[in-house]
Amino acid sequence: MADIQEQISKLCAEATFDAEGEFLLVNVPDEKWHSLAKALKEQLHFDVLSALVGVDWKESLGCMYYLTNSETHEMIHVKVATTNRETPRLHTVSDVWAVANFQEREVYDFFGIVFINHPDMRRFFLRTDWVGYPLRKDYDDSDATNPLRLTPEENEDDTFALVEDEKGETKRVNKKVFGADEYVINIGPQHPSTHGVMRYRASIDGEVVKKVDIVSGYIHRGIEKMCESLTYQQTLLYTERMDYMAAFMNRHCTCLCIEKALGIEVPHRAELIRMMMDELMRLHSHLLSYGCLTMDQGATTAFFYPFREREYIYDIFDKTCGARMSMSYDCIGGVVRDVHPDFVQDVRNFCDVLEKRIPEYHQLFSGNVIALGRMKDVGILDKEDCLNYAITGPSARAAGLHCDLRKTKPYSLYNEVEFDEIVLENGDSYDRYMVRLKEMEQSINILRQCCDMMDKEEGNEYCAKVPKLIKLPAGHWYQEVEASRGIFGVYIESDGNAKPFQKPYRMHFQSPCFNLVGVVDLTCKNNLIADLITVTASLDFVIPDIDR
């Protein structure tokens, strides 16, 4: 990191550094941020904006940018802030990393920071008539400010950009989302193929898609806001209610972040159990993805097959956790109880069953002429697009990107098992579909190795000794795991205050699905409107994980 710090100092003399934390922290004045961002990407190869977190530090408002080098997998974070709370402004980096487009809109929605030169400064989650910015510390949350509205939200066809000229002067430029001559159709929010309350507004020429505008936030629950009034143990509950098909991974990630902050060493058996639950959850998710993708193309028979196998997983969860969904099993320090006596044998039996069933899935659908016609060379997302939009998980590996955290930055006990990272190269809907089926085989392989490790485990310690009241020191931490749909990240900032009990000063969940929905326009453009549903199904995003 010392070498990186030296190079950044040469690029930006005004930058200051803090190298004491897990990642190098770079403090940059806003007026220097855009030029430094371009240099970080083009010269130092920090080509992925992994997370963008808005924070209200009371004396200032700003953002934490977590940047990753896709070749070395090194990470740094950059802090950019403004002391102007009345009209807070920062320069956009959406032209440097395309993923910042939606992420900066999210920050504007919740903190009111307007990003100079951002092309589309609309709210993303909240209604257009919402008053105030909920994640600011001075937010007025009274009913009088935002009374319950029972009227439908009107179409938002107007947006604006704050444009800066060569002299450094800014002016507001009003824009239209769609042109007057564009033919726009509406899909959702209540549509069976959106797999949740998501709305697409698509501009079409004949049957060819020219632009897709995402309208989200229909099930936004303010999870990050709620976490600011909860204990750290209580926040775990909400992590399972974002991507419910990655419930174990999300909760695992949050526990890892808190454990890292406290220096807690988790027992080997507990971490092994966590990893097994994560892989069962991954299988659970990929099975559902297969069923939904096939159903969206009319293959009703193929839709029912994976639900048969998912029942096995539900039964395993139910025996140990006492619930089929929202298991609340991982806890800070380990897991809440030891596994059921039948757990290891049940997992072995399930692996044997699923291994025999996967060829049936291929026979039912993979070679179907309609499936090939609808998915081959359709919805292409190449490697550069994945880096630019911070796409991870199966969708990125289908484009040839080696980004599996279990391999690149092993956490938990993934360095103790052997498995292959499935990487294809076409980046189309078909390869995204195939990656998930092949990853199921690797998860079976991991689970079998874990079962053998469980047989050799000595003792039954499933949780470390953890105080009832969790108190984090002042600071900030960031943790990532490989969830079902890509990299899931948790940002925690603590002010060290523990009166009357300690609650997070700021908690942010970096959702892989939020990035995935950001490429819907890119992947659907110039494809048939009939293929929009297939393309989005192959991206496999979950709406609650986007809205949070």
Predicted regions and their residues:
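Terminal low-complexity/charged segments
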Residues: 1-208, 285, 367, 371-378, ...
